Amino acid sequence: IVPCLLFQLPFEALTGIRDLPPALPMILLAWLYILAVFGFVKQAARRWFPQASAAAYLLTAAGAASGTQIYYLLHRPSVYEYAILCGATFVLWALWQWLCAANTPVNRRKALTFHLAFGSLCMALVAGCRPQMVLFAALALPILWPRYITEKRLCTRRGAGEAAAFILPVVLVAVGLMWYNAARFGSPFDFGANYNLTSNDMTRRGFAVGRIAPAAVTFLAGIPGVQTVFPYLTATRMQTNYMGLTITELYYGGAFACLPLLWGLAALPLARRRLGSRRDLRTVIRLVLVC
């Protein structure tokens, strides 16, 4: 519902033309996503790696932005990818704003409050795009914990006001989404996934242990296909011996193939001492891996 409210309805109201092609807002969302990646990496470096050079920042941000599968979403600009990209963009903007809030001095209350509220608004809007991505809201804990829990700022009057600014956007968006869900699907907690007009019955997909291992290997270690014409890489299909129906899509490689920066996870044991002195960073890494 959020992409419709942000793009489809305003476009129809201004032009009188229905059915805005998803490709147009997806291009804008892709640029906003890339901007958020650069902003997030900058704030993360400012907090945890203040001695990092500009070259290291640019290389990391460019690698993170280009390593995500935005290109795949733009390659298939349908309603399905539209919602995914919108949700991912809001997730990155939320994390960026929360890091900005954590890095903002407490004497700059207006800027601090704005970053907290805007970040929460973005994360709340994720539920109206791709509800599963709301799991990334857990990253607010290690980001904001040192200031508001460790330093006990939450127990002060100003801290309580900042907490209200953090919570209020979530409550307002949640009320709106729950009202919409109840009006359209009969329950405030039903986001309509079971009503998708798709190739399979969403209400009977079930959970099968036999599908876990092939899916994990495919989406982590899968590699793209190769062809003799530009761009030389092609999509491949998931191969499985599961004795049953497995709904799959074309993919261009798993996480480790599309995002080589993840190879750096192999060096985490070497950074144990540094991570030991940065508990919040260690928690962020663990939560990202879990999500």
What residues fall within each predicted segment?
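Membrane-proximal envelope and lipid/glycan-remodeling enzymes
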Residues: 1-291
